[in-house]
Amino acid sequence: MTSKEYAMLAAKTLDEKKALDISIIDIAERSGFADFFVLATVSSLRQMISLTDMVDEKLAEQGLIIKNIEGKGESGWILMDYGDLIINLFTEEARNKYQIEKIWGDCETIDFKEE
């Protein structure tokens, strides 16, 4: 699978499990550390932890192994590093605070529901 296909799989898994405001950002042209970000908002710490496990399991089934995970949810943000793919799960408050979409605003976003 390509990095984009992994990003799509992660986004679809998050969508199936009721994450909110899911987006995929293609950062390959501006980044030397990854090709795609997947961003999603969660409604609770419990959901954040559950989604972390579910997405990791789904990607591992396809051969993509996590390299690192940052945060434990208490900060309102968990970052899952798969190398070319970075998945960010936020509480609504943390997502508004860090404004990742604004930082990478000139990058292409991908609609995972249409692909």
Located regions from the model:
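Ribosome large-subunit tunnel/peptidyl-transferase-proximal elements
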Residues: 1-53, 57-67, 108-115
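Mid-chain, well-packed structural core segment of small domains
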Residues: 58-90
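C-terminal structural segments of small proteins and small subunits
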Residues: 79-110
